[in-house]
């Protein structure tokens, strides 16, 4: 889960990472009030989960509360690379002597953690890596040893930070590591990490990505979910522990196992090319179980998308046998009743497939078409969606 900047800075405060005071608002009047409360020039910053805010006009300096009001009026509603600005962070402006870069991330390729540090902050780190690779330190981190002050100082030194700020930077870097580990993050990035004229080190911007697989350890992380910006169908799926991602097509997809669902998306997209460009409407993985309740929840989510014209249920029976899946489909249709109003194309294979097919055949539901192969089922679902 990617966090907004103001949420990341909330975690900075929790872990004693020095930053500038500020608050979030969704109105221009609120921006003026916060600027008045701070009593100093402020930065008015669009809160979107995308880079390039400054170049798009989403970050402005305001010398007075009235300036903050004017900038907020201009930024709210701004479209930044497809992200519409609904919230603003109004934070105290800081005098900047130098800008640095620091991040901790999960290095999947090398199966380790990585610290990245550079004296070249305030610009895209990809640009630094491409044009000044010698100025970007990439330091592997042993999770068992962590990052103490000595190692944090070494990271800063390898990033070519000036000698006079190494000790102060080390304190901040070690606290960022504490955040990274303590909050189960996969990314903690500060760009810029600034040096003020009096040699303070401040995190002026922040990017944090949290590992959703660790949510059970962090019940407080639920507050970071931007429910207003999340698709309501995705929220409904999450309530049932279903893995759902809404797409922009017309064929609803339900499968068990991420690999099978991804393959199903491909075959439906291919089949749709000869049926007017029909495409998959979603990714929905119901996991290893396909009980009536799970299937009903999945169908309810998929059919809640007004773009869906047909549904392709593609299940391979493993631990959960095909007869159990078929029974689940029949009972799910009974549970949903009139809400199940789109044609279903069902393909079953695997454990006890013949019994599963018999159950669906005997049920003789008018919306269900049983098809033996995945390619044929994808073609039929695309055909029905294009009708």
Curated annotation (Swiss-Prot):
Residues holding substrate: 256, 318-320
TM spans (from-to): none
Pfam families (UniProt xref): ATP-grasp_2, Ligase_CoA
Keyword Secreted: no
GO BP term, pick one: tricarboxylic acid cycle
Assembly with partners or alone: Heterotetramer of two alpha and two beta subunits.
Protein name (database record): Succinate--CoA ligase [ADP-forming] subunit beta
Gene name of this polypeptide: sucC
